[in-house]
Regions:
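Sec-dependent bacterial lipoprotein signal peptides
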Residues: 1-19
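Generic hydrophobic/packing signal
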Residues: 20, 36, 49-55, 272, ...
Length: 445
């Protein structure tokens, strides 16, 4: 018992934060040397609970599993397991201290920022230029920008090594979804723009340009789809949400073995820290200052733009998303993976909700216009082309339990309804409202 007491007394000299870190800034309570900071006699408990749980545990250095302990008596270790006492520096998760959740998304090591998502900023910039090239670029030029990451006006983008195509639906249904985006680019260049340039007036079954009574002009394929809208709204889900929700913030991506800060210098980051930041970058990568995101004036055509819209409308609280992202990144620094996953799930669910809100909004917008005595078909087409892209995106959204809200088959069925017959030229309001009702029910809107 004396040896056990000595082990525990030595363990009080520092804190290993496994489950969470204390942010208590009050002066430490002076206690007798034989008691821990909760007044428990040394050696009588495996917990040294100085504010939050700091326990001895078993660590498996192959599977990286952790088993908290209340007692080490009669303990048998497996061949790949080690016993780690509180604050033992041999612990692969060793962390000499903890940090509180910052007021802004600001993290550093030795005074230099560790937040980095330059690759995400580059891809978002690529999306802006690609979207702006739909009416002027050839098929080869559009596909080069999308798949090769070259052909942009900014030499820095061309030499970045980043691409949009290889990140499209890369975590979910890539082989089935990615070709849809290639096809949109090809059809825009080979079908829509030749008809527009020839002065063809779009009509059911005829690609070209159509101007509505309100003055809006739309460049559409034979089914009435604005392919620039179906493409870019689809990329909100297939690129941004898939990368965030199903990739960088997903527990399956965040292996504790990738979060060893030992030996890191000023401004250097662990792989897990960087993964989290990369996920954040798909939302905030075009913001001038991530410490004060505005969701406006940054040229975004993807997730950030619509995050601002739903935040302004009160449909999704983006402050809650920001807080969860800060708390999750803090938990990574503190090696509190339970908290990391809890905060990650909050952010992932709320970001997913953006897709449901906008898909429903655009479908109902089209249905509302169709309900007029003389619908403005340019407005219908524009709303429903955007709606098509958001519906396509729904297969990447999750609920509060981390489960997908729609299967690919369900999404494909909705897309088929929009494409049936002459597509948007003869869709009816009842079909649109029924689809929107289903989306609302799934997301709890």
């Amino acid at each position: 018992m004396k040896m056990k007491n000595n082990i525990f007394f030595a363990a009080l000299s520092a804190c290993l934060i496994l489950a969470s870190c204390s942010s208590d800034t009050e002066e430490p309570v002076v206690v007798p040397a034989t008691l821990d900071c909760n007044g428990i006699e040394e050696g009588t408990s495996m917990q040294d609970d100085c504010g939050d749980c700091q326990q001895a545990y078993i660590y498996d250095f192959v599977s990286h599993n952790v088993q908290l302990l209340d007692d080490t008596m009669e303990l048998t270790l497996g061949q790949t397991e080690i016993l780690v006492m509180p604050n033992d520096p041999t612990n692969p998760y060793w962390n000499a201290g903890c940090i509180p959740v910052p007021s802004t998304y600001t993290f550093d090591r030795m005074g230099q920022s560790t937040v980095s998502y330059g690759g995400q900023t580059a891809r978002l910039q690529m999306a802006v230029e690609l979207y702006g090239s739909f009416s002027s670029a050839s098929e080869a030029e559009l596909l080069e920008m999308y798949n090769d990451g070259t052909g942009f006006s900014d030499p820095a983008l061309n030499s970045s090594g980043k691409k949009l195509g290889n990140k499209t639906a890369s975590y979910h249904y890539s082989s089935l979804v990615k070709p849809m985006f290639d096809a949109m680019l090809s059809k825009q260049a080979n079908v829509v723009m030749p008809a527009v340039n020839a002065g063809t007036i779009a009509a059911p079954g005829v690609a070209g340009e159509y101007t509505g009574a309100g003055g809006r002009s739309v460049k559409v394929d034979e089914k009435g789809f604005e392919l620039n809208q179906t493409f870019i709204k689809g990329m909100i889900g297939a690129l941004c949400v898939d990368q965030i929700v199903n990739g960088y913030l997903s527990p399956s991506k965040l292996d504790p073995a990738d979060n060893d800060p030992s030996g890191l210098g000023a401004g250097e980051y662990t792989t897990m820290e960087h993964y989290w930041d990369e996920g954040v970058g798909y939302l905030y990568g075009l913001e001038a200052d991530i410490t004060a995101p505005t969701f406006s004036g940054n040229g975004s055509v993807l997730l950030n733009k619509y995050a601002g819209k739903v935040n302004t409308a009160g449909d999704v609280d983006m402050n809650a998303v920001y807080d969860a992202l800060k708390a999750g990144r803090t938990a990574i620094v503190n090696m509190d993976y339970t908290e990391r996953d809890a905060q990650g799930l909050i952010a992932r669910e709320l970001i997913s909700k953006i897709l449901g809100v906008k898909a429903s909004d655009y479908l109902r917008g089209g249905a509302s216009e169709l309900g007029n005595t003389t619908p403005d078909m340019a407005e219908v087409i524009h709303d429903l082309s955007e709606g098509f892209g958001f519906v396509l995106s729904l297969q990447f959204a999750i609920d509060g339990s981390g489960n997908y809200l729609f299967t690919k088959e369900e999404v494909d069925a909705m897309l088929a309804n929009l494409e049936a017959g002459n597509g948007l030229w003869d869709i009816d309001a009842a079909t649109l409202n029924s689809m929107a009702d289903d989306i609302d029910a799934r997301f709890g809107l």
